[in-house]
Amino acid sequence: MKISLLIGILFCSTIFACGNKNEERFIFFLHNRFLETHELNELHPEFGRTEYREIIKEFENSGFKVISEKRNGNVNARNYALEVIEQIDSLINHGAEPNKITVIGTSKGGYIAQYVSTLANNPNLNFIFIASYRNSDIQNIPEINYCGNILTIYEKTDPFGVSTVERKENSTCKIKNFKEIELNTGMGHGFIF
């Protein structure tokens, strides 16, 4: 299922203001774990092909400058987040407004995005976490501390994505805006493909 249109609509219609089209807006898109160890054209045995290129293209067609790469190997989420933060800091140092920067992650990419939120500790950045929270995360990954404007999206039938309200309530950083969307597609974790 192509989630790019859904993300674009949600992005503009929920917690983030879409400003003047002449202003540069940046998206860091962080894909799921499957693509770390498989080629872009390989089919997931249960969910089919990941529409990575289509998602990037949709964001670009909507006027965003997209920063994304296909990760290779089983990368460490925290370490990769530090690399993303370096890029974000560079954009800000060159005049980009933090509120025009959004980090979007699906599944493992969502966990990387959560680390970016934590380690960047910038309440003006925007984040969309998709299918990337389990109830055990509070105990298993206690260092995550949401910071920024947060939108979470999860599928009701997906065991790898549930409500993040508990994480939000346990976070100590300022969260200006928080919205959560529960989908009911019946596709489980496959809705991110």
Question: How should each PLM-predicted stretch be described?
Answer:
Residues K21-E58:
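Short, surface-exposed "cap/lid" segments of acyl-processing enzymes
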